[in-house]
Amino acid sequence: MQNWLASVAVVILTSVGIPTTSWALEFTADRVTHTDRGFHHARIFYHDGMWRLEHNERGPVSVTIVRADRNEVWHLLPVTHHYKTVLYHPDYALHLATTLDDEISRERIGVQTLDGHPTVLYEVLTVSPGGGRASYYQWIATDINFPLKLAKKDGDWMVEYRHVKLGPVSDVFFELPRHYAPMDGDQ
């Protein structure tokens, strides 16, 4: 009986717009980016403002850990067991919202299936503080409410998330390994 009452209370509260709980976004995925320098593949682990990218390029594996909460980014070099610390910059930010910064219009273009997820494709127009405009295509997965793909309309760049798994990600992924030493010049 108590479970039934609790369920009814949650339904009533959410239907009138009162949040009952806020959940942090946590997921793992394969991330593919395309720029004028080619395609880049990485495995991403994300937990509420912290993320780890394990780059899958030719040569030695490298890892980037972004800690926006600490205003730091660590570039790990597993071959030498060293790391380099740099300051966090907004350029490191991921495009994980279902709306874009400085968005001024959004038009539904159609529906598609990406990586097994039903998506709605939008054309989005943004304006920069200087007045410049940019157009994007954004694919939002409707089953998991997640932006699977974002591409600049002119083809300049694209980011896509594949094999997205929503769920808890251990904090261990976002800490420096104990046996790593700072590179010369780092503290």
List each language-model region with its residue ranges.
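N-terminal leader/targeting segments and the immediate start of mature chains
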Residues: 1, 5-51, 80-81, 168-172, ...
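A short, compositionally biased
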Residues: 23, 47-49, 68-71, 107, ...
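A sequence-level detector of short linear motifs
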Residues: 28, 84-85, 120, 149, ...
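Generic structural motif
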Residues: 29, 104-107, 119
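An acidic-aromatic
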Residues: 40-96, 152-163
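Beta-strand-rich interaction surfaces with strong enrichment in secreted/lumenal proteins
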Residues: 42, 109-111
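Gly/Pro-enriched, hydrophobic low-complexity segments
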Residues: 57, 62, 115-180
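A short, amphipathic edge element
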Residues: 97-108, 159
